[in-house]
């Protein structure tokens, strides 16, 4: 499938699609005959094309990047369902089973890094390596604010279920909006073919509006630590020098906690912003660092 005005929805890879629990998980595959298998999980409001720049550099690995539910070309979750951090996990396990019966490597960016960590903990020894690009599990549930959090979740759910589809008059309008989320123009355009659909009314955003809503609950700090401890694979944490962890103001504490609870945690600081894996200035070096970790 190709949208001429936006370019290929598969970038430099090949389109794939899996079905789990009635949901379609669309994705992109690079080096289909390669080995080992890398499952790549994108960040919040991104899509599978976010790995298009770095995936070829990970050869000879077979790299499969999936649109999470509500993103890109994948299905939206039903109105009675949610987009909490763990909600994709059962379907991702089913998709992994369809892709490979053997060991896999899991790689995630930002929110996708948190999801990748939970997935790796559940898959146990089947996950041989975990790569986290500028992301950790970094939001905790405060027991004193549980009712407030649930109230926000219910209010946001009603708000975004009622929201009409969003349209952009031009690609420039879409790019301007993405800048607010820390994207440079080229990275925003890279995502456009899976993020947008052309219609007579303009460029319709494919993303489920409910992804903007508050989560029902977050993991507690103790639960986060247990998830970390459950990952049997060695973990590579990649912190962008101008990235989210740096901007959060608590990167050292987060990294210290990760190092304390992961069984094996190596951390590197790499030049670039939060989306460094999409920046051609940095992807060759980043891919080399990842391949060194995998060997």
Model-derived regions, located:
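Alpha/beta-hydrolase fold catalytic core
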Residues: 1-38, 59-62, 100-103, 137, ...
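Active-site loop/oxyanion-hole signature of alpha/beta-hydrolase fold enzymes
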Residues: 23, 68-107
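Conserved HGGG/HGGXW glycine-rich cap/lid loop of the alpha/beta-hydrolase fold
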Residues: 30-75
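Conserved hydrolase catalytic core segment
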Residues: 102-145
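A catalytic-pocket lid/entrance helix-loop region that shapes and gates access to the active site
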Residues: 133-167
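Alpha/beta-hydrolase
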Residues: 167-246
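Conserved loop-alpha-helix segment in the C-terminal half of the alpha/beta-hydrolase fold
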Residues: 232-273
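Catalytic histidine-centered segment of alpha/beta-hydrolase-like enzymes
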Residues: 272-281
